[in-house]
Amino acid sequence: MATNFTQELYEIGPMAYPLKMISKDVAEHMLGWNIPEEHQDLVHDHWRNFPAVSKYWHYVLALIYTMLMVTSLTGNGIVIWIFSTSKSLRSASNMFVINLAVFDLMMMLEMPLLIMNSFYQRLVGYQLGCDVYAVLGSLSGIGGAITNAVIAFDRYKTISSPLDGRINTVQAGLLIAFTWFWALPFTILPAFRIWGRFVPEGFLTTCSFDYFTEDQDTEVFVACIFVWSYCIPMALICYFYSQLFGAVRLHERMLQEQAKKMNVKSLASNKEDNSRSVEIRIAKVAFTIFFLFICAWTPYAFVTMTGAFGDRTLLTPIATMIPAVCCKVVSCIDPWVYAINHPRYRAELQKRLPWMGVREQDPDAVSTTTSVATAGFQPPAAEA
């Protein structure tokens, strides 16, 4: 079979299979050749049409994931440490930031498994190893998606209704519990074979839910998880951010019109301006993370929908591994987005880890100084 495939490849030419990799030392094997007979049902027939990937590609992938793991553990670890121990950051809104960092760290727990699989060039633990890997990925991926939606809701409430719209600690705790419950159904159901199942994909060193089996049950499962874990969070995020930006524009327009009527430059005090500026910067951080979420998960959503309903010939091993890497990259970038843009987080970083070279003035100190200066200023008395 391998000889016929190689001969066909040479006859048709390299352009017909641009993403299929053949190495001399594995040309006689096809994907799944090193999985024992009793576990062969794990591998879908689609993957058996591709030659086994060179061991060097496995090593490159292991190196990439090692770097991602170190970056994510460092960044998310610092986020959880600073947000959970800093008095200035101990707010209901920042509980969602910690929750997102926990989901990101959970995704990184997959990395040791994948690195080990890459060196063995197969799944270690077979079905059990596949289930553990996929459960971690499902919980963290779906949980992170809905947490982004909750953060968008919180930013909208905080900025559009700063006096009575802020979420309190109890409400934040309930919303965090909701994110975990939201991630459970499509993690538990395939893990226990109640609906769907977890199977290897790509290089057969990673696992996800089955989107290749040709039956109605699998197709309905793929459609439902697509709506549940991608479409609904995306719709909520888009709605809340559109409402947020609309509220900001309306507020600015009202202030400008009122100031024009009163023949003054601005109705907002310096303290209000500073406070609002901080909140808007935080909203920009949240929106940036949402954008990263789209970049990370849209390619993988395309892969799964193509596998279930589209042209499967597009899904070569490397074509499915690239979106999988993108999903892991975003969990590494999230904490550094906060380091770049979140004013109070940057101020705490400067205090605790000065060697990182962060330069940020404490927003609360700026507001206090501005208020004192404004209160202490007295206009000169009019001459008699």
Curated annotation (Swiss-Prot):
- Tagged with keyword Plastid: no
Topological domain ranges for the Cytoplasmic compartment: 84-94, 154-171, 241-284, 334-384
Keywords for this protein: Chromophore, Disulfide bond, G-protein coupled receptor, Glycoprotein, Membrane, Photoreceptor protein, Receptor, Retinal protein, Sensory transduction, Transducer, Transmembrane, Transmembrane helix, Vision
UniProt organism field? Manduca sexta
Q: What are the protein's GO molecular function terms?
A: G protein-coupled receptor activity; photoreceptor activity
Q: How does it sit in the membrane?
A: Multi-pass membrane protein
Where do transmembrane segments lie in this chain?
63-83, 95-115, 133-153, 172-192, 220-240, 285-305, 313-333
Tissue spec. comment? In the retina, expression is essentially uniformly distributed but a higher level is seen in the ventral region where the B-cells are localized.
- Protein's cellular compartments: Membrane
Which protein is depicted? Opsin-3
PANTHER family membership: OPSIN
State the protein's purpose.
Visual pigments are the light-absorbing molecules that mediate vision. They consist of an apoprotein, opsin, covalently linked to cis-retinal. May play a role in photoperiodic photoreception.
